[in-house]
Curated annotation (Swiss-Prot):
Domain of life according to the entry: Bacteria
Pfam families linked to this entry: Memo
Organism encoding this protein: Aquifex aeolicus (strain VF5)
Protein known as: MEMO1 family protein aq_1336
Disulfide pairings: none
Family statement: Belongs to the MEMO1 family.
Amino acid sequence: MKPKVRFFDLQPYGDKFVVRDPVGISQPFIATPELLFLLSLMDGTRDITDLQAEFFKKTGHLIPKEEINQVINFLDENYLLYNERFLNKLKEEREKILKKGYREPSHAGQAYPENPQELKNFIEETVNKNSEKFKARGILVPHMDLRVASGVYGSVYSAIKENEYDTVVLLGVSHYFHETPFSVLPLDLRTPLGDLKVDIERVEELQKMFDYDLSHDVLAYKNEHSIEFQTIFLKYLFPEVKVIPAIVSYGDTKSLKEIAHKITKVLEDSQNPLIISSVDFSHVGRKFGDPHSYDPSPRDREYINLLAELKNEEAFNLLQSDNNRTRIDGQFTNFVFLEILKNLGVKEGKLLDYDVYHEAPTDSKVSYAGMVFY
């Protein structure tokens, strides 16, 4: 047997690490650096004898084969090995979600109130801003913690709450395992205020334009807050609207333009579509691999100015030019977002609000903004 560990996420935890499953099938566990090194050797090319020898060669410590076998069994039991057992479980979980017919809210009662009346009060307080109103065709909103970023959420949704929309294209990012470049969730979105209906006719029409299954990455939506956080505002402000929930995961400018063109195509008979990009901006500091935090606003402003002018290629190239050094979120999502808006005749965008959250214990910062496009 030559075990192959599948992809997982790591988060520092003192002198150890929390190992998290980006697919959401397995429970997190604590791992030492030594264990992580052993896991890194499990790439499908080594059997137990090879693993023992390579670990000894690099560390000078001889692990008994029985212990290595225990680790392999633990990984297998928790579907953390890339093998037939994991693939069957993945298929089973996908089918389970699709069969259910709707996406359960995973953050209700934690990030926002689960009680309907309390949630209504929370949203009403958030969107009760006397801000300038816009007949916006597109909005860029954070997916930052609702309690932290309520002011920015409020700036945007207050600006459009008097509008009417018949279809919403909700573009998020994936914080979890996502194989395909682009996916669509063909399910209603349950909220404490009722179900936000999926625009299933347009979703099915969109699927016909792609040569891969757009629901293949349905598991990525299970805990995805970039989708969920917008649903509560949409259900409250536009209760009858239908939604196309989607994630843009990766792509080059050519393929991203093709995605945008296809989305635009299914909106041809929509009288009042709204396009949403649910993204945050820079992620800097020790939590994200920097030696310390720093002010990301100069870089953010440069990027925001390009977004406001709908210069998606320039904005994309700016981030690509230095490997997105401040880790601005949603570069692929924003490219598709702006391309759709240009296809719909939108001419300009405006920054309504911008802020930076500083997490003192980890000396890390996350920036976020609210914009309207019209």
